[in-house]
Amino acid sequence: MGDIEFKSSPEFSLGMEIELQLLNPDTLQLVDGISPLLAQTPENSWIQPEFNQAMVEIASQVCSNIPELEANIVAILRDLKTRCQALGMTICTAGTYPCCDRFASITPIPRYLSQQNTSGYLADLMMTCALQLHVGMPSGDVAIDIMGRLKPYLPILLALSASSPFWWGHDTSFASFRQRFLSSMRTYGICPTFKNWQDFTNFFATAQNAGMFEIIRDIHWDLRPQPDFGTLEVRVMDAQPTIKESMMLAAFIHSLIVDMYHHSQGKQTEFLLTPLPWLIERENYFRASRWGLDANYIEDEQGNSRPIRNIVKDILNVLAETADTLGNSSYLFQLEKRLDQGASYIRQRRVFESTGSVKAVVASLVSELEAELAIKSRQEAVAYGWL
């Protein structure tokens, strides 16, 4: 394979993908329902199959700002819920399905079947869901530059998004067990660092020749360029049970990337987190997945650490002006409140501690999304805490 063309897109445009679980509304068990769902959905629609037949992925339109993205995702999820209800299913999402008791049924698509063949037993256990955000880039070189700058922030995003404390009915003690599971897969996890777009294309040519990847989509790193879309795709995050949490994270990433771009153009001077050696990167990943917002992040090569909660507050202060310019301030305000109110992994554990039931945890995830999708007025949104 020769040079890969990076198809530029409008700077900092946005696209979101969310993976969700298909459930029986009475038993709250997983349902292998993707085939009938696809059968009643128009081609080239917002709905897409996932690796597991009991899961579905939705994809937004290309949007210019977070409010537009939010409106699009709300409309898509309402439509999805209506379609699922007609088929006797309901939906929810989190980084893992808390009370799984069976192997995954792989969606019979050649790419997924090939992945199953390569991954072996790991494919049978693949019951994870992610939130993915695409941000438009003007060129491949800019995408690779921002990729390197954003890399130290990935453990922060992991801690903020952690929503997978349960695995096969057990409390794993991790905030994000999804990240621990995926770290065992050959094409997932921490992305390498590249000098520029040509450096990336040289790497991909070597990897392709070695039989590691066939296409770019075979790369499942937590951060990857998408040349066909002209985007940088942030993939580190657990799926969020609520739309408002997804939008908080999207606004945080959007503001962060725009600020980084300004920094690269000499328009900003403050840059909080810097690249770290691989072993420290791995340790920060582990800490974020294990302790979530209570983790201490290693900031430098001397081993100095600070609480992630404090680092997030510092980042939000730095991003305040950029967020205001982008119209993201209200979302970041909600994100800061959430530092004290509790991320999803904390809420799930509270439900389990009060009920002793993992099924009750699933019911709470279903209820959280249903409550949002039922909101029809600004007054209801304020009461719910949406605004």
Curated annotation (Swiss-Prot):
Protein task: ATP-dependent carboxylate-amine ligase which exhibits weak glutamate--cysteine ligase activity.
Catalysed reaction equations from the record: L-cysteine + L-glutamate + ATP = gamma-L-glutamyl-L-cysteine + ADP + phosphate + H(+)
Name of the molecule in the record: Putative glutamate--cysteine ligase 2
Keywords from the UniProt entry: ATP-binding, Ligase, Nucleotide-binding
Classification via HAMAP family: Glu_cys_ligase_2
One Pfam match: GCS2
Family recorded in the similarity comment: Belongs to the glutamate--cysteine ligase type 2 family. YbdK subfamily.
